Regions:
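Active-site-proximal acidic secondary-structure segment that organizes catalysis
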Residues: 3, 20, 24, 132-178, ...
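AMP-binding/adenylate-forming domain of the ANL superfamily
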Residues: 16-33, 108-111, 154-155, 194, ...
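Flexible, Gly/Pro-enriched loop and linker segments at secondary-structure and domain junctions
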Residues: 40-46, 73-79, 117-131, 170-175, ...
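Short amphipathic alpha-helices and their capping loops
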Residues: 2-36, 60-106, 125, 159, ...
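Gly/Ser/Thr-rich phosphate-binding loops and adjoining beta-strand/alpha-helix segments
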Residues: 6-21, 38-58, 121-142, 217-281, ...
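His-Asp-centered acyl/peptidyl-transfer active-site segments
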Residues: 15-17, 32-43, 71-73, 187-196, ...
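A short, small/polar-residue-rich loop/turn motif at beta-strand boundaries
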Residues: 8-16, 51-68, 84-124, 197, ...
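Flexible, non-catalytic linker and terminal segments flanking ANL/adenylate-forming cores
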Residues: 1-20, 89, 217, 319-321, ...
Length: 428
């Protein structure tokens, strides 16, 4: 049996001239190289800080300290004959310019909607940062390419800014993105990789490889993407969901999503996709980079099963995928003819606000344009309800169809927790 912790240890601090992209990065790289105008893999966000509690000069200095703290921000892609690789530059962000601009709240709204722009994959930086000053707030708007950043990285980066602002020091990452890339390269040649391949062959044997909502439109009739927000019925509260799934709330929402997809498409099975943060070793807890693993979750629908049986199947597939999630995803998709059409990410209350000292700062992911998946649904836990933020291909789907499917998903969740359907939820 492969000792993955020891394998990671052997690659911490390893010095190379070039580092391979890890398996989470390689598919993103080729998509973006083939679609240079796309922002599908940008991660723009805004964090609002009250002006009366924050000094602008200290804030700018703290951002620079946070940037210097992580290797990922100093990495550059080089396209060699053997394929793309990372090169570590000696860049310092001590003199990095962070533009500051005074704007109205109305202007800020427009800036948020158009902030994401394509990155030059081979340029010096795969991120951009601005500070916008309104009457009440300093708003940090940032956009990081998914090649060097993920959701957990966002939390870590803001933690670093707060620590640098108040203490002048930050926690150093124990494992850098490049350490992990070297480890991932070794993993692909290990027995663990072979075991993961065997696991997925068993899961997908005889399975239908694709679940998709029937399209309303011919693709590209309406270029661009749609976006909507949908609030679940307020009676879907956290305690009811947690009781049904023994606290595994993320698995509950994935399972309900797969069930709704199977019923909506009239099939007896479904494959949907979710993500895992990929930081399965505690030494990665303060690492910034792209570590997320996409996981295909395949379920069969048998009406003779109890809800407990069904959710157990979902959890078995989900956590089996997490265990074997380092498998080369591109090869997995090719072998099993998989297509990422329906994706769901349970975010909980993680991204509603971020702490900045004793300040609870509003945080918001900004809209994108140019997505490749049919549907991407993010589930957020708020004070009174669960909220869905949905991006969809509007060259394929009418908004009415999106709302119909979300309603079917809501009805599934309500049924799972033993509630009847009302009109308390819906699009906002």
């Amino acid at each position: 049996m492969t000792d993955l912790k020891q394998m990671l240890t052997e690659h911490i601090g390893e010095k190379r001239d070039y580092y391979p992209l890890n398996q989470s990065q390689i598919g993103i790289y080729y998509y973006c190289k083939n679609h240079p105008e796309s922002v599908a893999y940008n991660l723009p966000s805004i964090c609002e800080l009250p002006k009366q509690k924050v000094a602008l000069s200290r804030l700018s200095a703290a951002i620079k300290i946070a940037l210097n703290n992580h290797v990922a921000f100093r990495c550059k892609i080089v396209d060699r004959s053997s394929g793309p690789v990372w090169v570590l530059t000696d860049r310092s962000f001590d003199d990095f310019e962070i533009p500051v601009e005074k704007v109205s709240e109305e202007a800020l709204t427009e800036i948020k909607n158009r902030y994401a722009k394509p990155f030059d994959l081979f340029g010096d930086l795969l991120f951009r940062i601005n500070i916008y000053e309104t009457e009440k707030n300093y708003s940090i708007i940032s956009d990081f390419h998914h090649l060097i950043y993920d959701g957990s990285s966002c939390s870590i980066w803001f933690q670093d800014i707060a620590a640098a602002y108040y203490n002048g020091t930050v926690e150093t990452e124990e494992v850098t993105m490049l350490d992990f890339c070297a480890y991932d390269d070794a993993y692909q040649k290990s027995q663990a990789e072979m075991d993961a391949i065997s696991y997925y062959r068993d899961v997908f044997q005889g399975a239908k490889p694709r679940t998709s909502i029937p399209a309303d439109l011919e693709e590209n009739d309406l270029p661009g993407d749609g976006y909507c927000v949908y609030c679940f019925d307020k009676r879907i509260d956290f305690s009811k969901v947690s009781a049904v799934c023994n606290g595994r709330v993320g698995a509950f929402f994935v399972g309900a999503f797969a069930y709704a997809a199977a019923k909506y498409t009239g099939t007896g099975d479904a494959v949907v996709y979710t993500g895992n943060h990929g930081r399965m070793d505690e030494r990665l807890r303060h690492s910034v980079g792209m570590f997320v693993r996409m996981l295909p979750v395949y379920v069969t629908i048998d009406e003779s099963f109890s809800l407990t049986d069904y959710l157990s199947q979902v959890q078995e597939r989900l956590y089996g995928g997490i265990k074997h999630g380092k498998c080369a995803f591109a090869a997995l998709m090719q072998e099993h003819k998989l297509s990422i059409d329906l994706s769901i990410l349970y975010q909980g209350d993680f991204f509603n606000h971020v702490p900045f000292g004793d300040i609870d700062c509003p945080w918001e992911a900004l809209p994108l344009h140019g997505m490749d998946d049919d549907f991407v649904i993010m589930v957020f836990k708020e004070k009174e309800h669960f909220k869905l933020k949905v991006e969809y291909r509007k060259d394929k789907y009418k908004l009415q169809t999106v709302h119909e499917f979300l309603r079917a998903y809501e009805e599934t969740v309500m049924t799972f927790i033993g509630e009847t359907v009302s009109n308390e939820g819906g699009a906002v």
